[in-house]
UniProtKB/Swiss-Prot annotation:
Family, similarity comment: Belongs to the MS5 protein family.
Name of this chain's protein: Protein POLLENLESS 3
Gene that encodes the chain: MS5
Source species of the chain: Arabidopsis thaliana (Mouse-ear cress)
Swiss-Prot/TrEMBL TPR repeat ranges: 95-131, 133-164, 191-224, 241-274
Function statement: Essential for male fertility, especially for microspore and pollen grain production. Involved in the regulation of cell division after male meiosis I and II to facilitate exit from meiosis and transition to G1.
Motif annotated as Nuclear localization signal 1, chain positions: 34-37
């Protein structure tokens, strides 16, 4: 029998028609309207308390969780350090516990303790966390002023990158730099380490090594911060034109996102301030160079002449025969020259000159030609006086000259002849008296 016939209503009876079917589904209740299930005290993992999400602390009740709670919620860093030690000894998330403890020690000014803790317990950490531990160790070295150890660690990191073991064989890696997550390649990481090495050697006054590291870093990646630091390095080596050229390039470069970076602005201001300070001292240095240019002693000191070679030119000068004779009246010296415009002083000794004497009145001739004031009296000379002095100096300079220079033997013979003549005259006087 057909099933439709069985469902027919008897005569005089009518069935209520069924509701029309639609394809619409019932909307889900929003999460804010739902009731939370009751908490279960048996298992903490089943709790859905957002407290750890709001305060950015891990959930649970382990030594590391208690240490983070003391650090971030209770704001008790000393208690947090002791709890981090407990977590490290218990083996509870040793990587995070060691790094967080070192950060807290750095904030408390206990960087040396943080360095020793990392060196003692980093072997317990995984291989993947060693790079971040090295970065934290570099910050602690910088904070505590241990620049030499920082340079050694940076050299080790650079060598690791050059051997291809820095990123675990990968070409790029996501890193957190200055609070931002960035994708950094091996070349960018190498440039960053070279820049840090240049800055460390700049603090150690190794300016040549610092320049090499900065130029290598700029060859990998152009960075304005490194350009400013390289300019500072060149100024330390007295290469001012090159430093000014670099600063001009930085100033004239187009505005980029890097221009608003705080380290770049600080480096540029520091370099400009140092350049202004050097240029302010430059006129004084030029004046002192001009003042000491004619000083033979200063020139000799600049040439680094040894003490024994100062009088080497005079070592072959023979001594006067009269100096070895017992009855000699004194040494032979040149006659004292008259110096114009110079005050006479009593008891002035004659100076023995071996060099070529300057023309008489050369300095005074220069003064008169320039028409300058008289050095000692500070009076302006009139034109008649200047003409008179010109004639006087010229006549004196063209005075009688010796026909020829006499040797020491001729001088000795003349002295002996004079003594013999004196003895003969004294003998004649004695004979006449008798």
């Amino acid at each position: 029998m057909c099933p439709c016939v069985e469902r027919r209503a008897p005569p005089g009876v009518y069935y209520t028609p069924p509701p029309a079917r639609t394809s619409d589904h019932v909307a889900a209740m929003p999460m804010t309207e739902r009731r939370r299930p009751p908490y279960s005290c048996s298992s903490s993992s089943e709790r859905r308390d957002p407290f750890h999400i709001v305060h950015k602390v891990p959930s649970g009740d382990s030594p590391y969780v208690r240490a983070k709670h003391a650090q971030l919620i209770d704001k008790d860093p000393n208690r947090a350090i002791s709890l981090f030690w407990t977590a490290i000894n218990a083996g509870d998330r040793v990587d995070s516990a060691l790094k967080d403890m070192a950060v807290v020690m750095k904030q408390l000014g206990r960087s040396d303790e943080g360095i020793e803790a990392i060196k003692s317990f980093r072997y317990l950490c995984s291989f993947e966390s060693q790079d971040s531990i090295d970065n934290l160790l570099l910050e602690l070295y910088k904070k505590s002023g241990r620049i030499e150890e920082e340079a050694v660690l940076l050299e080790h990191k650079l060598q690791t990158l050059e051997q291809g073991m820095g990123f675990g064989g990968r070409v790029s890696r996501a890193k957190r730099v200055q609070g931002k997550h960035v994708i950094m390649t091996i070349e960018q990481e190498k440039a960053r380490i070279l820049g840090n090495l240049g800055w460390v050697h700049l603090q150690l006054h190794n300016y040549g090594i610092a320049e090499q590291h900065y130029r290598r870093a700029l060859g990998l990646e152009r960075d304005k911060n490194k350009l400013c630091n390289l300019a500072i390095c060149l100024m330390r080596m007295s290469r001012i034109p090159e430093a000014k050229s670099l600063l001009d390039d930085v100033r004239d470069s187009p505005a980029e996102s890097e221009c608003g970076d705080e380290p770049f602005a600080k480096s540029y201001d520091r370099a400009v301030e140092m350049l202004a300070e050097i240029e302010s001292k430059k006129p004084e240095a030029d004046l002192s160079e001009k003042f000491y240019a004619g000083c033979s002693f200063v020139n000799r000191m600049k040439e680094n002449i040894a003490p024994g070679t100062a009088n080497k030119n005079y070592s072959d000068v023979s001594s006067s025969p009269a100096s070895v004779r017992p009855n000699s009246a004194g040494l032979y010296t040149q006659p004292r020259r008259c110096r114009l415009f110079e005050e006479e002083t009593r008891g002035a000794a004659r100076k023995l000159l071996f060099g070529k004497p300057q023309p008489f009145g050369s300095e005074q001739m220069k003064i008169l030609e320039r028409g300058e004031e008289e050095p000692m009296k500070r009076k302006k000379l009139d034109q008649n006086m200047i003409q008179y002095l010109h004639e006087f100096v010229k006549d004196t300079a063209d005075g009688p000259k010796s026909e020829s220079k006499k040797s020491w033997a001729d001088i000795a013979e003349e002295e002996e002849a004079e003594e013999e003549e004196e003895e003969r005259l004294q003998g004649e006087l004695k004979t006449a008296e008798m």
